[in-house]
Structure formats: structure tokens, C-alpha cells
Amino acid sequence: MSSVATTTALPRLPHTGKVTQLRVCLSEWTKLRSVRSTRWSMAAAVVFTIGIAALACAVVSHHWPHMSAADRADFHPLEVNLAGVQLAQLAIGVLGVLVITAEYSTGMIRASMTAVPRRLPVLWAKAIVYGLVTLALMIPATLIAFVVGESIFKGRHINIAFSHPGVARAVIGAALYLTVVGLFGLGLGAIVRNTAGGIATFAGIMFVLPPLMNVMPTSWNNAASPYLPLAAGQAIMSITSGNHLRPWVGFALLCGYAAAALAIASILLVRRDT
């Protein structure tokens, strides 16, 4: 009597493939666009950029006949065209914080770090994806804001053209500024790892610290204020000589602040437990 040996086939494990930076970026893109707060915050930033520009330009156009010659001489329409950036940066910065802190609050960050044991590619992917999405939306928004303002001012014969010196740099620079502000918020959020704390830190640095500088001696204020993130970054949107920093120098300094925040976040991400 002979026995027949039987073998049981083992189930094949799914092939997950190598974890690459591109795959991590695609995963972060899926997460970013699936979150409702992303759509609302980005929509708010676009509406603020265009809507406030239209409203501010309309108000100035209405009061233009009653303005003195001195006020008209000091007025530059581009500052009004880009007025919406002041509020849009709040939406962009807060969303930057939420991009990372929302995962900590839900515990989802553990799954992300388990899938990518090296950890750092997750933070890099968030920065890459959020930066590209912000830039892709804000460039059209600032361009539309400029066109809307230009069309309103034409009725008062206030001429401003995209070809004028510094105008193109200021308009495109506004989109670049908002993008880096978002990355700065992302870096702060990754450092704090708490939504309320991250937003408070971002708002404190960007909006509370500059007014507090006014209580310092004038010489100190004049020396330090241009180097704060808000003033330094917005130098790229200025076409007057009032700012102490040159446009690209100020923008480079803001990029340095964002890079420093992301660098500190990277170090802490490797050293701390999730």
C-alpha cells in the first residue's frame, strides 16, 4: 500500500513594492484631496485673494475723486490689488498646520510611519504636495486679482500694467509668498504636533509678533521688524523702496524660516516616538 504525499499550497503574499518618494507623494496627494478642510481652506484663500482685491479696488475707485493730490501721489494700485493676500495667508498657514497635526490628532500618523519606517519621506512628501498644490492655485488667484483690480481702476484712468517694472515680480511673488507661508505652517505643525498649539504658534509669529514690536524702542523696532517672517516675505510684493529688505532678499529670508522649521521638524520626527 502506497501513500500519496499531498502538499498544501501557501497563499501568496501581496507584492507591496518598494517604498519610494514618488509613491509616498502620491499617497499624501490622495490624503490631502480627500480631506474636506483642504477644499474649504483652499477655496477660502482663493476667494479672499480675488474677492478682497475687487472690494478694495472698488472702494478706492469710489473715493478717488475726493482724494487729495498728495494722497493720489502716494497711492500705488498694486498694494490694493494684492490686499487679499493678507487674509489668504491665514487660511494657507492654518491649513499647513492641519496637514500634519490632523494625523496626530486622529492617530493616523502611526499608520503612515509604519508604512514608511524611515519617517522623513512622509514629511518631505507632505511639504512637496502641499507646496505644489498651493502654488498651482495661488498663481491663477493672484493673476485674476490683478486683472480684476486693473479693470476697475481703468475707469478712473489709474494705469497699472503687468509690464511695469516690478509688477510681474510682485504678482507672481504673492503666490510664492503664500506657498512658503503654507510650508512654514506645516513645519510649525510638525514641531508642535498639536492643532491648537500649531495654529497659535503660527498666528503668534505672523500676526501678533509684528505689532508687539511697536512697544520696543524705535531704533530696535526699525532694526528688527524687517527681518520678521511677515515683513521679510512680503518684501517680494512691494515695488516701493519703503521696505528695508530687497524683494528677493526678504523672500529668501522667509524661505530660510520655512526651511529651518522643516529641518527642526525632521530632526524631531526621527528622534521622537509617534
Q: Where does each model-flagged region fall?
A:
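Secretory targeting signals
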Residues: 2-18, 38, 42-97, 123-191, ...
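A short amphipathic helical element positioned immediately N-terminal to and/or at the very start
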Residues: 21-33
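Generic structural signal for small/hydrophobic residues in well-ordered secondary structure
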Residues: 28, 116-118, 188, 194, ...
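Helix-loop interface residues and adjacent transmembrane-helix termini in multi-pass membrane transporters
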Residues: 33-35, 191-192, 271
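Residues that define the loop-to-transmembrane-helix transition and helix capping
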Residues: 39, 120, 196-197
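Transmembrane helix segments
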Residues: 51, 195-230
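Transmembrane helix boundary and interhelical loop/hinge segments in multi-pass membrane proteins
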Residues: 93-115, 119-120, 127
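Membrane-interface capping segments at transmembrane-helix boundaries
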Residues: 264-274
